[in-house]
Every structure is written in structure tokens, then in C-alpha cells.
Swiss-Prot record:
The keyword Nucleotide-binding applies. Keywords: Amino-acid biosynthesis, ATP-binding, Cytoplasm, Histidine biosynthesis, Hydrolase, Ligase, Methionine biosynthesis, Multifunctional enzyme, NADP, Nucleotide-binding, One-carbon metabolism, Oxidoreductase, Purine biosynthesis. This is C-1-tetrahydrofolate synthase, cytoplasmic. It comes from Spodoptera frugiperda (Fall armyworm). HAMAP family: FTHFS, THF_DHG_CYH. ATP binds at residues 378-385. The keyword Cell cycle does not apply.
Amino acid sequence: MWEPQGSLDPVLESIENELRDQVAEARSRWAGFDARLAIVQVGGREDSNVYIRMKLRAAENIGITAEHIQLPRDITETELLANITSLNESPYVHGIIVQMPLDSVHPIDSHAITDAVSPDKDVDGLNTINEGRVRVGDLSGFIPCTPAGCVELIKRTGVTIAGKNVVVLGRSRIVGTPVSELLKWEHATVTVCHSKTKNLSEITKTADILVVAIGRGEMVRGSWIKPGAVVIDCGINPISDPTKKSGQRLVGDVAYEEAVQVASHVTPVPGGVGPMTVAMLMRNTVQAARRQLDRLLAPTWPLRPLRITPLSPPPSDIVIARSQKPKDISELAHEIGLFSNEVSQYGRTKAKISLSVLDRMRNQQGAKYIVVAGITPTPLGEGKSTTLLGLVQALSAHRGRNSFAVMRQPSQGPTFGVKGGAAGGGYSQVIPMEEFNLHLTGDIHAGTAANNLLAAQMDARIFHELTQKDGPLFDRLVPKIKGVRKFSPIQLRRLKRLGITKTDPDTLTEGEKSKFARLNIDTSKIMWNRVVDLNDRYLRKITVGQSPTEKGFTRETAFDISVASEIMAILALGRDVEDIKERLANMVVALDKSGNPVTADDLGMTGALLVLLRDAFEPTLMQSLEGTPVLVHTGPFANIRHGCSSILADKIAMKLAGENGYVATEAGFGSDIGMEKFFDIKCRASGDTPHCAVIVSTVRALKMHGGGPPVSAGMPLNDVYVQENLELLSKGLCNLGKHISNGNKFGVPVVVAINKHGNDTPAELNLVKEFAVKNGAFRAVLCDHWAKGGLGALELADAVIEACDSKSKFDFLYPLQLSIQEKIQIIAKEMYGAGQVEYTDEVLEKIKTFTDMGYDKFPICMAKTSNSLTGDPAVKGAPTGFTLKINGIFASVGAGFVVPMVGEISKMPGLPTRPSIYDIDLNTKTGEIEGLF
């Protein structure tokens, strides 16, 4: 309370204590809470410095981190605006104030500068948006500090504002106009006067409350004031005073000594409205920080789903996708809690998300983690991607839960081959589907370039070593620059690995120079192929080096498809950029003639790889058909690699969704391949614990496993698949039972999602559902999201929510300290049902070599057909006791796993007789892609 004629110190102290308590309360909710104020000053006026020091002291007393950003006098308006934009975009700055006047040698529009400050960070309250809000009575924004301080002081007197006659003397944009509006919204009767007002003193004498901001020293005399009035003096004017050392003193617009004889309350100058203005600045800053915290900790996003109107029967996927207008990706990013500097837009429907999100939200608890896998599929697929999207559409758009789908980026090989796109289907898909299935943001192309540059450097190094003697080779590797030789950092790392401690190139012995310069790659033991993101069977075996310029140094090699590259697996498994860098450096591309590994770092490639892959570190934000968020990142093959989207994308999604949210991601193929690798490789690398596994099943696939005729892409289905056949279905249920059992072995609840197809009968669907529940499924539900979108997956969403709330007892299938053969044995028996494992002599020899090199402590990434639980794609159902034959093995040292090969696994698919390219065209009038799906 501000007592009559009393000091304002108790008022200021009370406000300071309130703000200090608010900061403490916020820190109790969020350990990393730090209210931050940026004070921008142009030039160095001493009067401005005085005000800034006041603000810095006030901030420190409250617990606000205030930064004084002093810019030079020669700064231009464009440069100043760039600084403000940077502060606007920073999630670590909550409030921005630009100290006026701007002391610049260049003309700068101060109004443009104040309007450049984001309304959400305009703690000075001078942005036109915030001023306009005050004008119309919307006080949800930031109120200008001096007017807010005036109203606060009046309230602290205990005087009721409503119904009082208020006179405001002054109409400035900063004080007079906004304070008059504020008092009007406090239900006072407000009269605004100014220097042209006639009979001014008579009007002021009618005021119960008088606010003066005219800018003329001691203009208002005691005779102008109504007895008992509250007087708020906003002026500060220097006048001559020979008794002062400076020769002047500061006075307000009111003759204070006269006013205190008449009024009940009068603010002193200095020490009145000035400190109160600073207090309101601090209040606005704390409010801004708390608003950001409230948004961060809100249980649900302010997500606005997109409405869909499903047609029956559903039209083609591309027709459905184009019937929906996506929301602008910047709008979706804002809804899910991203800041503009964390979002790099690629057009209006996709954007890269900065890894800095993980640092900003490091104290945020993660969301529930769900993996979607399947039974052993038919060549047509059973709808895992569609189920994944239907699930998150149901969770977000219909159950109001924060949820992400995290997906792999599809390769263009299958897109132009036979499979088509991988964006889901029907009313559960990613949009725009053409962008999702084609180049997207170029990550696969970046991986292709990095992979092939490494291959080019390796072959070039082999050539140069074959055509040069030790001395010239060393001199070219470590050239003199301005007469001085110097090792690069990556060369120093090689020296360290070689046990050479010298750092001056000129001090190396001839033997050390030779050891450093020669990699001595054994061309018969090269493990690194070039890649291309297309299906091209004629690249499965090629000869390189046939040009006369290569002097006869030819060798046989091959191209793989880009998503089979180890680099793609590393991007998917890296926990941060430093981890990715280390993994890239450790990639083994060949063995030397002594049998030692030759790495990418030995070839000097690590830094160049990082540069090529820089943008590919970040996941891409897209949206589902119902406007819910989807993160797309990396696309490692599910057979030769681990077949999962990236750890980084999952971690960003889990932070953004929050502890009450859900993140669902897909594992390639069935539980025997994709889900096992998700748990034993991806979760082991990430440290994240899954809460639930969803196994996708169809009646069609189970009939195939019961002995139905083969299912082939592009061929009509046999009648048994479109007519009720409970006997055939019953025989195939064993495959579903095996996949449920596989999930349960990891200690996570398994929800079975039964995708409905048009020809499925109620009896068939119920048979599958009853079997699943009796054989270990946590829940089994029917799903119709392909036809209905999220509404068709509500039962699935509810089952997943319930499963995630139950207690998961997740554990890995095997410990890493077991031998390579022991780990393979466990996977073969537990996941596939094998009785024993056989190895070729060559495989056994390689296992011994890998063990000697320390690779035996890596997890196992089995390369096996996805069409059977066995190694034979023709064997269906769930056989047991069979022999699994390992006929090849290699180590992906950078990715960090050993890959046993079961049967022939191609790393380069081929095009079929009639690939989908026959149907694809571009409408030259509309620019739309036709026939892609």
C-alpha cells in the first residue's frame, strides 16, 4: 500500500518480492528456467547509460538475466533490424527493449525499430500491435511500462478507480495516450488535455486522479489540484539550481512542494514514476518468460487439426492427398512449440528442424515411445505406415494427445520400381505425398554424394600410391605453404593412431614418412561401394579404372542403392553431431595388405563428409492428412541395415510432445527383422525405452501363411483371399502368434492392429482378434483408418494409451558381452524359431578376425529375407527347429554392428518388367505429377 504522502519504497519492494517469488516458482517447475532480457543500445549517451544501469540492477535483484547489447554509433538501420530479428528468433531471449533515443550517425526510424520487436517480446509495450491492443481493451499483450506503472501506483493508494474523474495532461504515444486508455478500461471517466487545451487549470481541478506527462517543468501548480486528489507526475525536467554542484536539478511537471499541500498522494521526481517504470519492465519480462514456460509445459499443443470428409469407397491415394490443403508448415511448427530460428522452411509444406531444440528442451521429460512393426508380410505390404499415421491422427486430432509420427524417408528406387510410395495410404497418409516420396529435402542425395566422394578418394589414393615413390607422395600429402609444412588436424589423428608422436613434418624419419603416407589398401579387400538412389540391376557388378589415364589399374566393384550405405545407418544412429562425426571417422572402407582396417579418417575424409551431410543431420517436419506433425529422417534399408528412422528425430519428437505425449515410429518388415533391430540396435544406441509395440496384421497375409497361393504385386488376388475361408486363416494364425511372442520377449506390451480390408468377413476378423488376445497380446483391435482416417483408429489409440500406462519391463534380447555366434544363436532361436545355426568356413574365419579386432562387442544386424521367418522366402507360417545358414558376414564399424548374411541379399534392386515409371508423367499445364501412385 502507498500511504498518503508516504514513501514509494515499500511499493517498489513489494513488487520486487512478488517478481522474485514468481521467478522462484517458475524454477521449481522447470530447472532450467531463466528469464532473459535484452537491452539494446545504439551509441553511448550517458543519460541512456544511467537508465540502463538501473534496469540491470533491478533485473539482478529479481533474478532476471539482463544482457546489455551496446551497438556502435555507425550502425545502420538495416544492421540494427538484423540484430533485433536475431533476438526475436532466439528462444533464450524473452524480453527485448531498445533504449531510446538512438545515438547513431545514420538516420534510423525509431518507430520502425520499436515495431520490429516481436509483440511477444516487446516488454516495453511500444510495438504498434501491443499499443493497439491497449486501445481496444485487449490487455493480454504487454502494456507500456510507464502507463502500467501509473495505474499500478494509483491502485496501490487504495483508491477505487472505477467511477472517478481522471484528467490526463499529455497525449504522447508513450505515456499520455496509453494511460488514458488504461484508465478508461478501469471504468474511470477520462479527460485528455494537452498544451492547446483552454481553461486547463479549471479542468485539472475537477480530477480525482491527475496524471501529468506534458514535459514542462513544474507547470502544474498546487492551485490546479483538487484537494485529496491522487497526482501521478511522469515528467522529468532539468532546471537551473546554483546550489547544486552540477548547477541544475531534476523536477517533474508538477510543483511538488505545492502539490503535497493539497493532494493525498503525489509521486516524487526523481524516485517516483521512473523506478515504477523499471519495475513494470521487470514484470513484463517475467511475464514473457512465464508465458513461454507455460506453453512449454502445457499438457497439449494448441493444435488445429485439418478436417477430412472420407468418401466411400475411398478414391486413389493421390486423389485423397490432393483433396486436402496442407496448413503452412510454419503454422504447424508454431503449434507444436518450435521457434522460428529452429525451423528452416523448404517451401510451405516441409521444413528442417534444428538440433538446437534438444539443447533448449534438455530438461523436458520425454513422451511415450511406440514402435509399429508387423507380421511376416505379403509382397503387397500389410499397412504399417498407414497404421502408424492412422494411430497418430487418432491420438492428436481425435483424442487431444500430443503425438508424432516419425518415419523413414523412402528411397526413389522402390518408388519408380514396383512398390510405389511409402507415405501411408487412404485417409491416413503424409502430405504432400509427392514431395515425401521424391527428393524431399535432399538428405538421401547428400548421403549419396558423401558415400561416393569417399569411394572416389579411396580409388584416387590407391592410384597415387601405385604411381608415386614415398618421398613425392609424402610431399604432396603435406605440401609446403609459404615455405612451411604443417599437418592438418585429421593427419595428426592418423599419426597418433600410428603411434607417431611427432607433430613437425620435417622431423619424421623416412620410415615414418612412408608409414604415414602409404595406406597400402588391399584391393581384394575393399568393402566400400558407390551408391545411387535408383533400382539398377546392371550396377550390381562393374569394373572401374578402364580409362587409359588410370594406367591399367582396374578392379571389380559394384553400386549399392543409396539407402544401403553405411552412412545412412550412421545418420540414423547418431545421438548428436559429435557422435555422427566419430562414427563417420571409424567407417572401415578396406583392409590394408597386413589385414589392418583402413578408415574414412585415414583417407582424410571425416570433415568433408560432415560438410556434405550438414543439412542431413536435421529431420524434416511434414504433416499427416489431418494436420498432425510428422518427422521424416533417414532411410536405412531394413534388410542389410537396421531399417529405422533416426534417433535424433525420435528424441526431438519426444521432447516436443512432452511427458504426456506419444511418439510412434515404424520398424521395417516384421518383428523378426525390424522390431528386433529397433530394440537391440536403435534403442541400445539411443538409451530410450519403448513403452509399447504395435503388430500390424491382415487376414490376407495370415491366409497366405496358412497355405494360400502366392501373393504377387501387380497380379490379381486368388479367390481364397477375397472369400471367407476360416480354415485357411486358422492355419496361418501361428505366424501372428510368433510375432506377438517376439514382442513379449522384450518385455513390452503388444497391441495387435488388425487392418480391415473390404473382403474380410466379421467371422474372420473376430477369429484373428480372439486368437491374438489368447496368445499374449495386450489388446487386439480392428482398424479402419485407411477408409476413415483417425476416426478409424480410435480403438487402436485407446489401446496404445492403455498399454503405455501399463508397466513396461523392457530388456534387450541379449547382452553385448556375448560372442558373435552366441548373439546370432539367440536371435535365430528366439526371433525366428530356428533349431540351430550353421556357418561357412569363410564366415567362421571372419568372425575370428572381427573378434580379434574387438567387433564382437557390437550388436547384431541380421540380413535375412523379410518374406519368411526362415532364410527361405518360400517358407510361410511359423516353422520351428529348422537350420539357419549364415553364408556371409561383414562389420559396419562406424554404424556399430555386425551383419550376418542369410541367403542372397541384394543391395541393389532391379526394375521389374513393367515398373511404375510407365504410369508417371508431369502435367505441363498444372505442374502436377500424375500416375506416381
